[in-house]
C-alpha cells in the first residue's frame, strides 16, 4: 500500500498523518554531528532525584519494531511514570494542530512553486519528484495537488516519499518509534508530555525566510541521490546501535550537505538543547520520566547529556 502511494501523485492535498512532524525532525537531525558513543539509552540520577529518569536517542523514521532491540529499554519504560517526547503526540495528532500545519505549508492563494523557482531550479525539482512518484509538476494533476506547497513543505514531502519508496516494506508514518513510546505509555496509563509545543516547532521549521526555503529545496533536489544514500547509511548505523558511524554520516551531511552551517546547527540543535534542559529538572523532580529525542541531541560538548552533567546530574550509559 505504501509503495503504491509513493509511485503515483497524491490523490489529495491531505498529507499523511505525522508527515510534517516526522520529516521536519529528520531534516534537523541530519545536520547534527555526534561523538563516538555506542549507546542509545542513558540513565539520569543524582542531585535531588529520588528515582532515576532516562533519555533515549532515536532516528525518527525507524519503525517501532526496533524498540525491543534498544539495550535496557524495558527497565527504562517499566520504572518511569511519564514519556516525554520532543512534542506530545496528543497535540501533534489533534485536528487543530494538523490544520495549522497544513496552512503553514501552503503558499498564498494564487501563488505556486513555479513563481519562486527559475526554470533550471524547476528542472531539478521535477527530476527529484519524478524519481519518487513517476510524475512531476509538468503533470497538471501534480501541480494541482502539490503546486501550492511552500519550499519547506515540498522538501519534507519529497523526503517522506523517499522513505516510502525505498523502505516500502517497513516504513509506516503511523508506526514510528517516537510515536510508539508514547503509545506504550498511554496503554499503561502513564502520562505523556513534550519538550516543545507545536507552535514552537512550526516556527522553527516553517518560519524560515522564503529565500532560505528555496535554497534548501533546490540543494536537496540537486543532491537527491546523496540524500537517499545518507538516509540509508544513517538508518543502518542506528539499527546497529553504532553511534560512531551515525555521527560520521551526520557530520559529513552537516559539512557538505544543504545547510547554512553553524547558524543552522545553533538554531536547530544547541538552542533547543538548552531550552529542553531548562525544563527537564522540573519534569524529573515531579516523576521519573523517559525522554525520547533525536539521537543527534545526545552527544558533544553542547549536547543534552553534557548540559545535564553541568547541572550536577549523574548521566550514565545503559550498557549490556
Residue ranges of predicted features:
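Bacterial N-terminal signal peptides
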Residues: 21-33
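Boundary at the C-terminal end of the N-terminal hydrophobic targeting segment
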Residues: 35-38
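Bacterial N-terminal signal peptides that target proteins for export
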Residues: 5-24
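Short hydrophobic "helix-edge" motifs at membrane interfaces and signal-peptide entry regions
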Residues: 25, 47-49, 283-285
Amino acid at each position: 500500500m505504501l509503495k503504491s502511494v509513493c509511485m503515483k501523485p497524491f490523490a489529495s492535498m491531505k498529507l499523511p498523518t505525522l508527515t510534517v512532524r516526522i520529516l521536519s525532525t529528520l531534516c534537523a537531525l541530519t545536520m547534527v554531528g555526534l561523538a563516538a558513543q555506542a549507546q542509545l539509552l542513558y540513565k539520569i540520577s543524582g542531585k535531588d532525584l529520588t528515582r532515576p529518569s532516562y533519555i533515549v536517542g532515536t532516528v525518527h523514521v525507524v519503525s517501532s519494531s526496533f524498540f525491543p532491540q534498544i539495550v535496557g529499554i524495558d527497565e527504562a519504560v517499566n520504572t518511569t511514570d511519564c514519556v516525554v517526547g520532543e512534542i506530545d503526540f496528543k497535540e501533534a495528532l489533534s485536528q487543530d494542530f494538523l490544520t495549522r500545519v497544513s496552512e503553514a505549508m501552503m503558499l498564498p492563494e494564487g501563488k505556486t512553486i513555479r513563481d519562486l523557482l527559475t526554470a533550471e531550479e524547476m528542472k531539478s525539482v521535477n527530476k527529484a519528484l519524478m524519481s519518487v512518484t513517476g510524475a512531476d509538476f509538468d503533470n497538471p494533476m501534480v501541480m494541482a495537488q502539490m503546486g501550492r506547497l511552500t519550499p519547506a513543505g515540498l522538501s519534507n514531502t519529497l523526503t517522506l516519499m523517499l522513505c516510502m519508496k525505498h523502505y516500502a516494506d517497513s516504513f509506516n508514518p503511523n508506526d514510528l518509534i517516537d510515536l510508539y513510546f508514547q503509545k506504550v505509555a498511554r496503554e499503561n496509563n502513564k502520562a505523556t508530555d513534550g519538550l516543545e509545543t507545536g507552535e514552537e516547532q512550526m516556527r522553527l521549521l516553517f518560519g524560515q525566510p522564503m529565500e532560505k526555503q528555496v535554497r534548501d529545496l533546490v540543494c536537496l533536489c540537486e543532491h537527491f541521490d546523496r540524500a537517499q544514500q545518507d538516509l540509508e547509511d544513517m538508518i543502518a548505523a542506528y539499527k546497529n546501535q553504532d553511534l560512531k558511524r551515525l555521527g560520521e554520516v551526520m557530520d559529513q551531511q552537516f559539512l557538505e550537505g544543504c545547510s547554512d552551517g553553524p547558524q543552522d546547527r545553533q538554531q536547530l540543535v544547541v538552542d533547543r538543547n538548552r531550552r529542553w534542559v531548562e525544563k527537564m529538572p522540573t519534569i524529573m523532580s515531579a516523576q521519573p520520566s523517559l525522554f525520547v529525542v533525536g539521537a543527534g541531541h545526545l552527544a558533544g560538548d553542547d549536547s543534552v547529556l553534557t548540559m545535564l552533567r553541568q547541572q550536577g546530574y549523574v548521566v550514565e550509559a545503559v550498557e549490556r
